[in-house]
Amino acid sequence: MTEGKIYSKISLFALPIFIGQLFQQFYNVADSLVVGRYLGKQALAAVSSSGSLIFLLVGFINGVFVGAGVVIGRYYGARENEKVHTAVHTTTAFAVLSGLFLTAAGMLLTPVILRLMNTPADVLPESIRYFRLYFAGALGNVLYNAFNGIFQARGDSRHPLYYLIISSITNVVLDILFVKYFKWGVGGAATATVISQFLSAIISFVKLTTVDDVHKIVPHDVRIDWPMLREVLATGLPTGVQNSVIGLANVIVQSNINDFGSDAMAGCGAYFKIEGFAFLPVTSFSVALTTFTSQNLGAKQYDRVKKGTAFGLVSGVALAELIGIVFVIFAPSLIGMFNSSPEVVAFGAMQARTEALFYCVLSLSHCMAGIIRGAGKTMVPMLIMLICWCVIRVAYITITVHFIPDIRVVFWGYPITWMLSSVCFTLYYFKGDWMHNFERLDARRNAAANRN
């Protein structure tokens, strides 16, 4: 990422991420399509509303791996190979421990959280079953995300693509097998997801043990180096905290949707599944910009950073808005693929037509956050997103719904807070001194070493 044509480097790095996320989104949609078609709208509500709860519990740990990727990318760009080796093995060890913790926490807390979310009684038993099975296999999800961060930090987005394709195809086949033929219900959908996630984690691990560079995982070197873990956590914890608090805010939003009944849950759950396609350019360019920024700032190529970030921002915003326009036009047909109930379709289409045209500002926020994280300034995106997407969003919805009991009030909470965060990120991008952050970090580290 530090050499060659900027536009082609970013595009070629982002493209495999885009395609990989596309396949991942297909298998997320496949879960809901199979469940909605063969098990009915209550089961669809149980599965489709899963995103906010999963993000609440998984988002924190996976956010830490964003920090790991920044640290590895920084040392890789600076050619400090020994530190790259230490960071890779510390990340792997931490992934194993945190994945086991997440499994225990998820299985224990699922019933409590679902009840706090006002999950309707006709949906609750199936929701508990689905989530407990999902979190029983959380270790596979965490390990895959850790390995994915290592691949991306070394500038490799192709291999994660291959493994996602394999995982996605496996998930779709098992979904149909377990739900349609074995009659395992929502438990079959959860089991298919767990198996496919472990498969991608295992393949990624095997590949990283065979690569011939400083990112190679040597199993007997997998241990936590505490100074390195502190550095990873210092960079990644803000993103982890941000993910968890945003997840908590979305759980609160979901509980407001749940108050409108199982039709609203199913319709909005279906919308959230198709909304994932709008995140394809958002995620791919955000990750590409984080890696591009961390490597080039590590190599002190500041002009290259300016040109690359401008290209990434324009590309991510334009593609997200194009997808949003398609959603507005075809909303009823897209929601109707999951369940043909007129009430379910009405709720999902209403949400799509309220939010989709604002995907441009959502993409702008995420891409700018990716750039700033790549510079190691992870506290800034955390604070902006916590204030805008959590505090303001929850306060707006809680207060407004009390006076106007209309579900569209809940829907508007998203675009309003996306616009606020975009204003904040734009101001910091042009006014904040984020580009020279690594130099300050190196100066502090050298000063501390000299004192010792």
List the predicted regions and their residue ranges.
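Residue-level signal for short hydrophobic patches within transmembrane helices
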Residues: 3, 7-26, 30, 53-60, ...
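Transmembrane helical elements of multi-pass membrane transporters/channels
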Residues: 12-31, 133, 144, 167, ...
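Short alpha-helical transmembrane segments in multi-pass integral membrane proteins
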Residues: 1-14, 72-139, 181-237, 293-358, ...
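Small-residue-rich hydrophobic transmembrane alpha-helices
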Residues: 44-104, 141-160, 254, 267-331, ...
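Hydrophobic transmembrane alpha-helices of multi-pass small-molecule transporters
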Residues: 56-59, 171-176, 201-205, 277-280, ...
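Short runs within selected transmembrane alpha-helices of multi-pass transporters and secretion channels
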Residues: 65, 133-152, 160-168, 189-202, ...
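Small-residue hotspots at the loop-to-helix junctions and early N-terminal turns
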Residues: 41-52, 131, 190, 262-277, ...
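Helix-terminus/linker motif at the lipid-water interface of multi-pass membrane proteins
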Residues: 26-45, 114-121, 177-184, 244-271, ...
